[in-house]
Amino acid sequence: MRRALPALVLLTSACTVTGTAVPVGGNLALVDAGRTSAALDAVKAAAEAVLSYDSGNPGAFDQAVAANVTGAAKDQLTQLFDQVRKSPQPVHLVTRVRQAAALEFTGDRVRDLAVLQQDSSGTNGLATVAFTALRDGGRWRLSDIAVNPAQPAPAPQPDDGSTGGLRDAALAGARAAAGALFTTDSSDPAGSYARAEAVVTGPLLDDYRAKKATYVEAIRKSGTKVALGPDPMAAALSLGGGRATVLFFTTLQVTDAAGRVTGRPFTTELDVVRAGSTWKATAVRPVTAA
């Protein structure tokens, strides 16, 4: 991000929001692929409408909120856009959903993890958000907007060969792989590398082994300890054939040599593949602004 956008500053400074899991068997995300996709499309349209703003036509923003928002999300949007609406300078902010994956879907309620890109006057920035939406009278309305979210995963379905069980096994595997890949300690660089190497396979494993000395030295020189934040979030973008692509978000907790801790939002895509009873990463693609 070259320069912080007014709205993005508000988005990334919002409080992390927690949520609740749904009962086992209640999560139809990717199980009912057609309705999951339709719900994600509806949430995408609603999010892009209410998170864009043109100071030359403020009434359009109010109309978008009235049509697409309910419950707590109304107050959340008021807070997020308070400074933007008071700006003495013209604002033309366009928000697009870059990626989105369903965390849970129950037919009349959907929660998704989305990467937003905001553009204004040639500058751009990213934010990762968890949206909750409710179907009301045949229309999906946003009911909660959690920026830099840390929310518990839905209760997992048994790994019994069903689509839901495969999905949740892949997500658990992706979270475990992410914990090993993105957790490092400069006082134990060799151990940090070994933990990462143990959770990768295929081309990624070849790359790690070829660059082992470089990785170990980079960890040692960093002078930091990095850990995942609480309740890291993972949602499947695709699933099939013992493979999955997972959208993963956490706020990394980075501790420097003086003991100071800084939170760094981090979003990435992980390709994972089933390897016996475990899942291993075959590719990692950090999500950055276009």
Task: Locate the predicted segments by residue.
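Juxtamembrane and targeting peptides
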Residues: 2-45, 111, 127, 146-183, ...
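A broadly structural signal marking compact, well-ordered functional cores
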Residues: 16-22, 196, 206-214, 220, ...
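Core segments of small alpha/beta cavity-forming domains
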Residues: 31-86, 162-221
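A compositionally biased, intrinsically disordered/low-complexity signal enriched
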Residues: 40, 50, 69, 102, ...
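Intrinsically disordered, glycine/charged-rich N-terminal periplasmic/extracytoplasmic linker segments
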Residues: 70-78, 82, 96-105, 110-111, ...
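A mature extracytoplasmic/lumenal domain signature
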Residues: 81, 116-118, 146-149, 212, ...
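Surface-exposed, charged secondary-structure patches
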Residues: 86-123, 220-258
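Short beta-strand edge/turn micro-motifs at domain boundaries
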Residues: 124-158, 245, 265-290
